[in-house]
């Protein structure tokens, strides 16, 4: 693990390599950033398998990529309200934190897939390759948004799992 400085009550580091997750029940997109939180890159798309195999994947990923913390996309409506998918993402984020033992924050993922599709289309890839990469690029867009929000605010963005309830609006996040 890299040396990290903790700044949040949930143990989320102020530096160190982050990984973002675009959670889905079939595929999970993953992106990572450098330890200084400057550049985010799509890493891969993980096909969802059994809970045991998925756990081993994320444990191995955290170790091999020296991940200090996770950012999990939270799908919410344009008005800030949550959906059934939001509950699934919250459950996954709690599972990821428990499984890997790493701090995990939720961050608004509105429009990340739209932005990812636009980004991929600029590269003139085939439809098949677009479908294969869109979740990883959506995770990259999510991580870029998280990093930018942290820089803009001068503090951590998103919500830690403990203070985030499904009744609140995330427009202020």
Swiss-Prot record:
<comment type="similarity">
    <text>Belongs to the YqgF nuclease family.</text>
</comment>
<dbReference type="InterPro" id="IPR006641">
    <property type="entry name" value="YqgF/RNaseH-like_dom"/>
</dbReference>
<dbReference type="GO" id="GO:0004518">
    <property type="term" value="F:nuclease activity"/>
</dbReference>
<protein>
    <recommendedName>
        <fullName>Putative pre-16S rRNA nuclease</fullName>
        <ecNumber>3.1.-.-</ecNumber>
    </recommendedName>
</protein>
<comment type="function">
    <text>Could be a nuclease involved in processing of the 5'-end of pre-16S rRNA.</text>
</comment>
<dbReference type="InterPro" id="IPR005227">
    <property type="entry name" value="YqgF"/>
</dbReference>
<dbReference type="InterPro" id="IPR037027">
    <property type="entry name" value="YqgF/RNaseH-like_dom_sf"/>
</dbReference>
<keyword id="KW-0540">Nuclease</keyword>
<dbReference type="InterPro" id="IPR012337">
    <property type="entry name" value="RNaseH-like_sf"/>
</dbReference>
<dbReference type="Pfam" id="PF03652">
    <property type="entry name" value="RuvX"/>
</dbReference>
<dbReference type="GO" id="GO:0000967">
    <property type="term" value="P:rRNA 5'-end processing"/>
</dbReference>
<keyword id="KW-0378">Hydrolase</keyword>
<keyword id="KW-0963">Cytoplasm</keyword>
<dbReference type="GO" id="GO:0005737">
    <property type="term" value="C:cytoplasm"/>
</dbReference>
<keyword id="KW-0690">Ribosome biogenesis</keyword>
